[in-house]
Amino acid sequence: MSGVRMQKKNRRALGQSLEMAQFLDSGSNKIKRRIRDLERLLKKKKDILPSNIIVEKERTLEALRLELHNHEVKENIRKNAKKYHMVRFFERKKALRRYKKALKTYKADENEANKEALENAEVDLCYVVNFPKSEKYISIFTEDDTEASAETNLRRKAFRQLVRGKIADKSLPVSLSNILAGKKLSEEAIGVTLDDALSRSNQTDASHQESDEDSDSNENEKEEDDFFE
């Protein structure tokens, strides 16, 4: 019996794989239509469908949603690459010139002001190269972006802070040394995103909360010890 069950399981897996195969690398409209069809099927006939079919369709639906998301990200990257190619090209050259100038100045006089200027120039250069391909590019040089909204300025600041943090913990997709060697983001890489910043912020908040809870717990224990002495 176990062999029969295994054969049925393999056939179901093969059927699901074949269903997914026809949607891989297909247009988003085709994927969306299939998602809607599956959603309607599960909504209308969930009470009468066998449980194994429900599980199978739900897994296919989840896989299709992921495929749609990946397709939309790739399409967004393609559009942004075409739209902002020249802007990023000139900003990269400008940021590189400023970095080399700041480095030369710092080597001539290693004071705090020159050190800070060099660090800022490094952030700017890494910002331009590692800015996420999936996002509308935000110019690092504000004098070239006089019509920027308050939200744009906030996002620019957030990206700069994120890049600065990733320089410190050496987690940039393209490091400064690689940039100076002429390297850029690969076609598959997206770059840094604000999701990274939010994740970092949440981890910091959680760490602070745990620290506060430990502190409160220690104080409560001390008060109890004092009470029973």
From Swiss-Prot:
UniProt KW Metal-binding keyword: no
Signal peptide segment: none
Coiled coil: 24-119
Span list, region Disordered: 196-229
Chief localization: nucleus
Domain of life per record: Eukaryota
Biased amino acid composition, Acidic residues: 211-229
Keyword rRNA processing in record: yes
One BP annotation, GO: maturation of SSU-rRNA from tricistronic rRNA transcript (SSU-rRNA, 5.8S rRNA, LSU-rRNA)
Protein location: Nucleus, Nucleolus
Annotated Pfam families: Efg1
Alphabetic keyword roster: Coiled coil, Nucleus, rRNA processing
GO CC, any one term: preribosome, small subunit precursor
Annotated function: Involved in rRNA processing.
Entry similarity comment: Belongs to the EFG1 family.
Protein name: rRNA-processing protein EFG1
